[in-house]
Amino acid sequence: MNYPVNPDLMPALMAVFQHVRTRIQSELDCQRLDLTPPDVHVLKLIDEQRGLNLQDLGRQMCRDKALITRKIRELEGRNLVRRERNPSDQRSFQLFLTDEGLAIHQHAEAIMSRVHDELFAPLTPVEQATLVHLLDQCLAAQPLEDI
C-alpha cells in the first residue's frame, strides 16, 4: 500500500546525506588521504570481494564502465589497486588492493565509522534498528533495476 509522502522527508534525508558526505570528505582531507567518499567505497568493495571485475564493480556502484575504468587507473597510478588477468577469462581483469591500498582503506574506514557513530549516537539502539528497517522497507518496494 502506498501512503501520502511527508514533504519534509526528502529534504531531511538529503541534509543527512550531505552532512555525512561533507564530514567524511573533511576528515579525509585533514588526514591527507586524497580520497573522496566514492573512492573509499571502491576500495571497500574491492577489499570485500577480492578479484572483483570492472563490470561488477560498475554495477554495484551504479556507474558506467568508462567511469569505473578511469577511477581504477587513477587508483592503480597511486599504487592502491592492482589488476590481474582473470585466469578463467583472459579478456577480463580481477581487482585487488595493494598493501598500501589496504592500509589506506582501513584508515578511511575508521574515519567513516567515526563519522557515522557521531551522527547516529543520539539514537537509541531500538531507534537505529527502526531506521534501518524503515529504509530497507523503502528500498524493498523499488524495482530491482533501480536498486
Swiss-Prot record:
Gene3D superfamilies: Winged helix-like DNA-binding domain superfamily/Winged helix DNA-binding domain. Residues 6-140 form the HTH marR-type domain. It comes from the Bacteria. Changing T69A: In strain: PA48. Changing R70W: In strain: OCR1; leads to increased expression of mexAB-oprM. InterPro entries: HTH_MarR-typ (IPR000835), Metal_resp_HTH_trans_reg (IPR052067), WH-like_DNA-bd_sf (IPR036388), WH_DNA-bd_sf (IPR036390). Changing V126E: In strain: 58823, 65629, 55699 and GRR. PANTHER family: HTH-TYPE TRANSCRIPTIONAL REGULATOR PCHR. Homodimer. Repressor of the mexAB-oprM multidrug resistance operon. Also represses its own expression. Many variants lead to increased expression of the mexAB-oprM operon. This is Multidrug resistance operon repressor.
